């Protein structure tokens, strides 16, 4: 998605209102930062770890700055199922509103799952239950086709490298947690 300069400036301004260390945003965006990871801290105290040499910043921008989920009504006692949780950006966003409910997050790819666990742990999110698993129509081992950006893996794109992962059915998730 091409973004014009005005939109980019608005996004940076929004970052100054959400993140205490917003000044790191352009360093990650322009790939100037020499670290593998960065942790953004919100004014509300959430810490968000992401990889600097990936599309994690784009995902952070979509969830936290563009606010793709702002029209979702998330209530205090909701049960949320985050399928393809990636590094937990939506999970962290939802955790601000769903404080007495439960958030189940499913991420089958080890590199993403590891950062997801870090994000859950460093924020002491007791109501978040992570699973290193894909979600599909049945209990099985399935192929996930890896995308080089670590954010767009798919069960339906056989043009890229396949990774075999465990899968749980949505029916089982609901049956076991109802």
Give the ranges of each region predicted by the language model.
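Phosphate/nucleotide-binding beta-alpha loop and adjacent structural elements of enzyme active sites
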Residues: 1-178
